[in-house]
A protein has these predicted regions:
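Low-complexity, intrinsically disordered or signal/transmembrane-proximal segments
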Residues: 11, 16, 21-24, 57
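Polybasic, lysine-rich low-complexity intrinsically disordered segments
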Residues: 33, 61-62
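His/Asp/Glu-rich metal-coordinating catalytic cores
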Residues: 64-134, 139-350, 369-382, 401-405
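Hard-cation-handling environments
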Residues: 264-392, 396-398, 402-421, 425, ...
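C-terminal tails and terminal domains of large nucleic-acid-associated
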Residues: 585-620
Length: 621
């Protein structure tokens, strides 16, 4: 295969020296593990390719483009005006790269939905120009949709080793094969088509987070990813301020910056600050200690592990994602776990309660998480009197009720619960206003696009940009699907592309729409009321009293009188309607009238409006 690649490179016009350079690069050695076409595509993408290399294939297109003054397009497909679903397109001529590919979690208006991913139809329409996915870090709101994307697009994915390890696990779970994951480190520079991308180390609540400095034909674009400025991080690798300053000196055309904490003044505390709280709780606790945290925050987990070891406690990991991610983090060297301190759940009985520390999922009150099941006595480890539970996270918007219920249940079981309103058990991974100001000062961007947040977050970040001296006409409050066109000396919003939400329900992708969600909401509110009407097939004559089936409306055994009245009303109504039925084979009008009549009856009797489902059963007798 290697020989074949060299031949193809020669035919495309590469010099012997250029081809030989690939022979001696680590990238080439890694790429040969991919399929031939994939390898060729990636190698071409990472090479600075002059127009002459493709003169044979693109001559007419290149001649046409020279007179059109090409613009760089920035197109967010998700992540604006919402939490999650982060995805941003950078497009110039024949090259498209996509930054992040995340999911959002369903809200209370989406019953039965597992997750929400961005609408990728624009990428499908332009698949031949898509070169790569560039991932800033491994949180679900940045990688959660990648398996669905790679089922459609056979392009490389670039990310740090921890990010790619999480993606690889996700792809394995979804049985997505024949992919090409390209590992990079902070400080690396790669070239994909016309884009030159440098990965810059940032601090965040997950290992391996990077910002992106993208050099394009019209100027430098900086995308911060999720970040905060932490000078004392757990891994002793602080944010690379020097690289941001270096790009500020070069001149930044546009900045896309994290808006999550743009409402909050001051600076986000260092992750290391939590060590003081953990030390205090571990010193005072007399029984077992259970810590619930995000599994992906290996820095938080490392602090808990270190504190437990100092206090002579063994450590047990519970919850599927906690077990999986800690194993990955340990294997990659991000997490130090003393072998003799980690035990399985079954062996905890061999230790006194004051020697036990359990790290579990469930900081958001998720119904299938370890902490939730422990609080509901649906787990081998049942929390009780004398236990101390630390919920080391703040509730994500929309999860407040779930978290509150778990806290209440833990108190009812006699546990001592330590959470964010009582102690400093959580710090954010996102920059506050003073850190955002620092980034404005360092980068001095000509144009600014606030990203990653609800509308209120974006608005406050845009306000801050104006305070920092950026021309208000150079600040773009965009919506998902907007197209921002950037030239070397110009910027304007110009149209939209398809965008929105694709709902995932089990194995179904995008087959749930607004009508289905509306019916599900109605079902969840007042239930289902079904009337089964038997009729003679040839004559349309009513053959008996309709049968009634309800779900989530009333408990039939306690509602005999209502059901009897409903059957009588349904029989009278069906009899009248059957007499008027002109076409015995078409019961559409009959069912619509039954539905309307039963709705009025039930509303008058119960003040409820269940989903009413008339069913006509034709009997040939």
């Amino acid at each position: 295969m290697t020989r074949t690649i060299f031949i193809v490179f020669a035919q495309l016009g590469f010099s012997h020296n250029t081809t030989e350079q690939f022979r001696h690069t680590a990238f080439f050695a890694a790429a040969t593990k991919c399929s031939f076409l994939r390898t060729l595509r990636v190698m071409l993408a990472r090479t600075v390719i002059s127009a002459s290399c493709f003169a044979v294939h693109r001559k007419e297109k290149n001649l046409a483009r020279k007179s059109t003054a090409p613009q760089l397009k920035i197109i967010p497909l998700g992540g604006l005006g919402e939490i999650g679903k982060n995805m941003t397109v950078l497009e110039y001529n024949e090259d498209i790269i996509v930054i992040d590919c995340g999911l959002a979690f369903p809200d209370e208006e989406m019953p039965g939905i597992d997750m929400v991913i961005p609408d990728m139809s624009y990428l499908e329409q332009n698949a031949e120009r898509l070169r790569a996915f560039i991932i800033t870090h491994g949180h679900e709101d940045h990688i959660g949709a990648i398996s669905y994307a790679l089922e459609k697009f056979k392009v490389p994915v670039f990310g740090t080793k921890f990010t790619l390890a999480l993606i690889e696990h996700k792809l394995h779970e979804h049985h997505v094969e024949d992919t090409c994951l390209e590992c990079i480190n902070a400080g690396d520079v790669i070239e994909i088509g016309c884009f030159k991308i440098e990965f810059i180390k940032v601090s965040h609540s997950i290992a391996g987070a990077v910002a992106l400095a993208v050099t394009t034909p019209v100027g430098i674009i900086v995308h911060t990813g999720d970040f905060k400025v932490d000078y004392t991080p757990i891994d002793n690798e602080p944010i690379d301020i020097n690289s941001f300053a270096r790009y500020g000196t070069k001149g930044v055309l546009a900045l896309l910056m994290d808006s999550t904490n743009a409402e909050l003044s001051g600076v986000t505390p260092s992750e290391k600050e939590l060590g003081k709280t953990f030390e205090k709780v571990f010193t005072e606790a007399q029984g077992r200690i259970i810590v619930a945290s995000f599994a992906s925050n290996v820095y938080r987990i490392q602090q808990v592990v270190d504190t437990a070891v100092r206090h002579n406690r063994v450590i047990c990991f519970q919850g599927r994602s906690m077990v999986m991610i800690t194993k990955i983090a340990k294997d990659l060297g991000y997490l130090e776990l003393p072998e003799d301190s980690v035990v399985e759940l079954e062996k905890l009985k061999n230790y006194e309660n004051n020697r036990v520390c359990v790290l579990t999922t469930g900081s958001q009150g998720e119904s299938m998480s370890g902490l939730f099941r422990m609080a509901n006595a649906n787990h081998k480890l049942i929390i009780g009197k004398g236990d101390t539970v630390i919920i080391s996270a703040s509730a994500i918007p929309g999860n407040e009720k779930s978290v509150g219920r778990v806290i209440n249940q833990l108190f009812q079981r006699g546990a001592n619960v330590v959470y964010d309103r009582l102690a400093d058990v959580h710090v954010s991974g996102h920059a506050r206003r003073e850190e955002l100001k620092l980034m404005f000062r360092l980068l001095k961007p000509k144009y600014f696009i606030p990203v990653h947040g609800e509308t209120r977050h974006l608005y406050r970040n845009a306000q801050l940009a104006e305070e920092m001296g950026i021309d208000p006409s150079h600040i773009f409050m965009m919506d998902n699907g907007n197209v921002l066109e950037l030239g070397k000396r110009s910027a304007k919003l110009n149209g939209t592309v398809p965008s929105g939400a694709i709902l995932i329900d089990g194995l179904g992708v995008g087959d749930i729409g607004a009508a289905v969600l509306r019916e599900r909401r109605l079902l969840s509110q007042d239930g289902l009321f079904s009337i089964i009407v038997p009729v003679q097939k040839s004559t349309g004559e009513l053959l008996g009293i309709p049968e009634i089936i309800t779900r989530g409306f009333v408990y039939i055994k306690d509602s005999d009188e209502l059901i009897a009245e409903a059957k009588e009303f349904a029989f009278d109504l069906a009899s009248k309607l059957a007499e008027k039925q002109s076409r015995k084979s078409d019961w559409t009008g009959f069912k619509a009238s039954m539905k309307s009549g039963m709705k009025s009856f039930l509303l008058s009797k119960t003040k409820r409006t269940p989903i009413i489902l008339p069913i006509v059963v034709e009997i040939d007798c």
